[in-house]
Amino acid sequence: KEKKKINFLNPVSENPDGLGFKMNMNDIIATFACVAMEELDKSLRKRRIIGEIYREELKNLKKIKLLNYKKDRLPNYQIFPVHVVNRNKFAKFMWENNVQVNINNRRNDAYSIFGGLNKKLKNLNKVDKDVILLPIHLDLKKNDISRVIELVKKFDNL
């Protein structure tokens, strides 16, 4: 039996041939969101703590580079993107060690319906090849954060 190749970065790799997905919240999800607003400040604080720990611990690596945050701006740490050399190898390494990493906001021009890749978009071309998201969700415990950092550093030294 042929082993199926796993795409760690795009498990739903489709090439849509039409536009228009209705991705609105339904009333139940909207109610959950309204209730969650009461916890927003607490959630943002926890994400900021995790993000600052990552930034401190991962700031001087060779294969992983942090995004350049401007001094006059405060990130909300909704996601924690990093630039990484050999993103696919990094993703495979992290997934094999039971740490879920992924990519976010894939470029639309990757889909044929939008006309193909635009090589003039230099920054987009770069980040589409090397940016990956580290876990930064609210269920992370201190030992989870330490483990992510340990594995990122281990990959950096491979």
Language-model regions, residue ranges each:
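PLP-dependent aminotransferase class I/II
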Residues: 1-158
